[in-house]
C-alpha cells in the first residue's frame, strides 16, 4: 500500500526513515509506502546523519539531554525519535551513535476535541473529578489529553478556569522548544518539561499551587505513589495509560495497584474503528 490521495496525507502521523529501507508513513490505517509507485529509493546512513545534523543545527552536544533519551523536540511541535547504537556509561545511556532509524512525529493538535468531553468530568457541584484516559499505543491519548488540558485551563460558562500543572516528561504535550510551548494548553497552564513524573509532581505541588496535575503515560510504581501524594493534597489528576479497556487494567499488577489507590474517579476509553475514533466516558471502578 502507499499514500495516494489528499485524505490519506491529512491522516499521516509519522514519517519513518530506516537505513537501507524506503521511506514509509504511519497513518491510522497502518504503515504505508510513501512512494506512489511503491518504488521509493532506499534511505542511507548519510541521509539520517544529514537530517539529524539539520534539526540539531549541527550541534548535537546542545541536544544531548534529550538525544540520549531517544528523541528531539523540534520547532513547530514536531518530535524526532532516534534509534542507533547506545553509548552506555555507568549503567546509563550517555549518547547515541551509528544512527539507524528516525521517526518524525507530526503532532496532532485538535483544538476543540475535548470541549464536549470535559463537562462530563465534573461532579454535580462543579468539582473536577480525576480522570484516566485509556487506549492502545497510537490510539490518540496524547491528543485528547492535550486538548482537555487546554479546556480545563481556559474554563467555560459552566466551569471556572483551573490552574493546571503539566509534567511533560517526554515533551509530547506542550512540545516545548527552548522554553516555549509549541502547543496550545490554555492561559492557566504551567509546564515542567523533561522531568520524570515521580520527581516533577512533588516539585509543582511545592512551587506552583496547581488545582490539576496532568501527566502522559503512567508506567511505573513511583508514578502512582507521586499521584497518590497529589490526590492526598486535594489536587485533581488528569493522566493517560496504555490499555484498551477497563478490564485490561485489572490484568496487570501495576494497573491493579493504580485502581486500588482510588485516585481516579472517571475514565475515558478511546476506541478506533475503521480510522474513526470514539470516546466513552464513565466511572472508573476501584479494585479490591
Regions found by a protein language model. Give the residues of each.
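Conserved small/polar residues in nucleotide/adenosyl-binding loops
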Residues: 1-6
